[in-house]
Amino acid sequence: MVTSAQALKKYGDPTLENNMVVWDVPTELEVGVIPKKLYCNKDMVAPLSAAFKNLIDTGYVKELKTFDGCFNIRKKRGLTSMSLHSWGIAIDVNAAWNQLNMTPTLSAGFVKCFTDANFEWGGTWERKDGMHFQLKSI
């Protein structure tokens, strides 16, 4: 699992936004609720491209109801460490149905579309975060 300490070491102070880009999502990867332009870490572009392609190719894209954020400088809810959203290397989807510490509702096939694209899913953690996908490695 990527930690905030690792992200800080690799990317530096998140408030400087040194590694952030505006990704113009290619037309063939446009997925309904995802913004056409996404502000994220440059290291998210290839994995997100792969995940979106997987969702489209497998038909699991129909399960994507909401996009609930990528870049947001903040601490993890209820904790003192910084969220990986602070460096734009995490994405939340379908948040209303996958609240923190609740049983996740995302299908295994949907999750696999992301985990096959170098993402780790928060739905398997002890402190379940079923809306959350973050880079598996940086």
Regions found by a protein language model. Name each.
Residues 18-19, 41, 54, 72, ...:
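Detector for Asparagine
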Residues 78-138:
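Catalytic cores and adjacent binding grooves of peptidoglycan-active enzymes
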Residues 13, 33, 60, 70, ...:
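Intrinsically disordered, low-complexity regions
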